[in-house]
């Protein structure tokens, strides 16, 4: 299968056929037919995306094995353009899984598929999704082999990347797989010209995979919101995001785009991938049709090929805030008729509020803006019952700005700690905080969370000040969402459960405000609680830091009420012990002797 042609044509495609933008069939069973999707996407795009999707669902199959299935699905789709059989009228997702289930090799290679194929949609699609392996091991060719393939058989190299990227990221939006493939092609061309190819590939692939994980995390986060909160939460988040990105868009247009974005996200999360992809491409075209009303920065995106255009729009920086928005917003706190407007249609009125503050305040995070809208709603619910509502809600704007100042101050405090002490000590500070908040979590998970939080701090504290809060709170909320997903499967404690379920917009601030878990009962210290051996003496710096962090976590779990100065004292004593024992003639006997002395010293500090 010669996929290099596919990739090149994907990149050079122009506009796709537009499909009834913003018109939604009220029938819940409405779906596009496969001939419509095939025509809209073109054959080459259809085959490329089909390869990505089958690779995500049949992860053990080789590229050669999947080629036959891809061609079979493609031939059937092509036949449906002129031959409208009853089967062609089925939803695209249904047809896709019909083809998978009809393939004898699928039943042989995937025993579980028999159970899935016996189900009806949407349960069948959900069953396949549930069996995706998220721990699949990637096959990474050596740089020399990669460069040889690039020179002699570039089609094989790129098709292999689509296959590998898709099965290693089974929930990644398939067009994103193709966009990443294009970047990989450029990366390979660049690194194959470098003298130190191995270093170049290592550094560039790390960046590309980080981008891949980021796209997948954001996509997964949207689905997590839909699964755990009312749909209006996702709509509000999208409205804040659209208003941030396109501040000159009026409310009606911003609201329409919000509805469209929310609809295609729902299709993606329900695993209706063909519907999802078609709608994403439609939204791209619709965005370009309205570029003058949306953003002065869209021109550069709308003049490039389709695949690049979609990625360009998704990653586009916010447009400049129009000069007329520099004036204070008065219509929500100074208008004497606020309560009448709120009573007339509270959802639309609150949407207008969220749109107004989001387009004006790009320096504020979407999560803060959602929380502000929720607090404004509470304010109106209270004030509109009083004898003098305007007097009651007139301080709403001051309250909003004071809360924003507090949030900025907290962010600055953490960035100052990071800059003063460095990432590793900042990571340890976070590790202490979160071990006290949720001591029930495993040592390695806590260390991983602290490391990811420190990475977010390192990245977001380095961006311009007016971008820090959106960066930090956006990324932290995604990380906390993952934590909450684990909490749902493996209960941590009541305080964490409350933060995960009470309010999406307040989730990050809820976790920040959490104190030590007062209900936690520390386990008794045994000989197995702490383990020190001479491996630390030969460990590299990174490994030594990890060993120290494991000691920190264990220490807090058995002595959760230790104050910061006592934790620092114990850490210093730990380092003294390591220094002493690693210079002793016999390392292990020294550790065995010094361990109980260290533990007893630290336990005496515990109140």
Curated annotation (Swiss-Prot):
Residues 19-24 form a propeptide. Plasma. The gene is alb-b. Disulfide bonds join 80-88, 101-117, 116-127, 147-192, 191-200, 223-269, 268-276, 288-302, 301-312, 339-384, 383-392, 415-461, 460-471, 484-500, 499-510, 537-582, 581-590. It comes from Xenopus laevis. PROSITE patterns: ALBUMIN_1, ALBUMIN_2. The keyword GTP-binding does not apply. Belongs to the ALB/AFP/VDB family. InterPro entries: ALB/AFP/VDB (IPR000264), Serum_albumin-like (IPR020858), Serum_albumin/AFP/Afamin (IPR021177), Serum_albumin_CS (IPR020857), Serum_albumin_N (IPR014760). Keywords: Cleavage on pair of basic residues, Copper, Disulfide bond, Lipid-binding, Metal-binding, Repeat, Secreted, Signal. GO terms for cellular component: blood microparticle; cytoplasm. Residues 1-18 form the signal peptide. GO terms for molecular function: lipid binding; metal ion binding. It holds the Pfam family Serum_albumin. Cu cation binds at residue 30. Residues 22-209, 210-402, 403-600 form the Albumin domain. Serum albumin, the main protein of plasma, has a good binding capacity for water, Ca(2+), Na(+), K(+), fatty acids, hormones, bilirubin and drugs. Its main function is the regulation of the colloidal osmotic pressure of blood. This is Albumin B. It is found in: Secreted. The keyword Disulfide bond applies. SMART domains: ALBUMIN (SM00103).
């Amino acid at each position: 299968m010669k996929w290099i042609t596919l990739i090149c044509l994907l990149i050079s495609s122009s506009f796709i056929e537009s499909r009834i933008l913003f018109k939604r069939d009220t029938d819940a069973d409405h779906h596009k037919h496969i001939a419509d999707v095939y025509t809209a996407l073109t054959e080459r795009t259809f085959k490329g995306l089909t390869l990505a999707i089958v690779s995500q669902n049949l992860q053990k199959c080789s590229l050669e094995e999947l080629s036959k299935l891809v061609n079979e699905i493609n031939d059937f789709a092509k036949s449906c353009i002129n031959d409208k059989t009853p089967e062609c009228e089925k939803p695209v997702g249904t047809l896709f899984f019909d083809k998978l289930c009809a393939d004898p090799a699928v039943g042989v290679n995937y025993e579980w598929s028999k159970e899935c194929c016996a189900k009806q949609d949407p349960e069948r699609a959900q069953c396949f999704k549930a069996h995706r392996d998220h721990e699949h091991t990637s096959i990474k060719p050596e740089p020399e082999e990669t460069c040889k393939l690039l020179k002699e058989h570039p089609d094989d190299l790129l098709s292999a990347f689509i296959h590998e990227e898709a099965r290693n990221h089974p929930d990644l939006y398939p067009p994103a797989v193709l966009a990443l493939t294009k970047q990989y092609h450029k990366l390979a061309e660049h690194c194959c010209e470098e003298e130190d190819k191995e270093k170049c590939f290592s550094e560039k692939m790390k960046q590309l995979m980080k981008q891949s994980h980021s796209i997948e995390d954001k996509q997964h986060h949207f689905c997590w919101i839909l699964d755990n909160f009312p749909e209006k939460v996702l709509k509000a988040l999208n409205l804040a995001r659209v208003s941030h990105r396109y501040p000159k868009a009026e409310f009606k247009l911003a609201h329409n785009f919000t509805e469209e974005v929310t609809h295609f996200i729902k299709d993606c999360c329900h695993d209706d991938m063909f519907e999802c992809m078609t709608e994403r491409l439609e939204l791209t075209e619709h965005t370009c049709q309205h570029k003058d009303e949306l953003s002065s920065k869209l021109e550069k995106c709308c003049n490039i090929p389709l695949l690049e255009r979609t990625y360009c729009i998704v990653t586009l920086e916010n447009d400049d805030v129009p000069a007329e928005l520099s004036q204070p917003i008065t219509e929500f706190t100074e208008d004497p008729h606020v309560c009448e407007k709120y009573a007339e249609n509270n959802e639309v009125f609150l949407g207008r509020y969220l749109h107004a503050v989001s387009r004006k305040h790009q320096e504020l995070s979407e999560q803060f803006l959602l929380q502000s809208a929720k607090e404004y709603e509470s304010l109106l619910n209270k004030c509109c019952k009083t004898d003098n509502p305007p007097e009651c809600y007139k301080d709403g704007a001051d309250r909003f700005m004071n809360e924003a100042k507090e949030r900025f101050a907290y962010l600055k405090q953490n960035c100052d700690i990071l800059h003063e002490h460095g990432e590793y000590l900042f990571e340890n500070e976070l590790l202490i905080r979160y071990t006290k908040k949720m001591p029930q979590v495993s040592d390695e998970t806590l260390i991983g969370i602290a490391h990811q939080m420190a990475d977010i701090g390192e990245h977001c504290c380095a961006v311009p000040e007016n971008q820090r809060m959106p960066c930090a709170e956006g990324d932290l909320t995604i990380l906390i969402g993952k934590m909450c997903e684990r909490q749902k499967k493996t209960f941590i404690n009541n305080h964490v459960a409350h933060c995960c379920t009470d309010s999406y917009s307040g989730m990050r601030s809820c976790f920040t405000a959490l104190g030590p878990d007062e209900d936690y009962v520390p386990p008794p210290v045994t000989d197995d609680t702490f383990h020190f051996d001479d491996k630390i003496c030969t460990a590299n710096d990174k490994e030594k830091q990890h060993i120290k962090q494991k000691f920190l976590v264990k220490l807090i779990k058995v002595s959760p009420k230790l104050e910061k100065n006592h934790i620092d004292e114990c850490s210093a004593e730990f380092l003294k012990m390591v220094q002493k024992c690693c210079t002793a003639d016999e390392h292990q006997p020294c550790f065995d002797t010094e361990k109980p002395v260290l533990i007893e010293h630290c336990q005496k500090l515990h109140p």
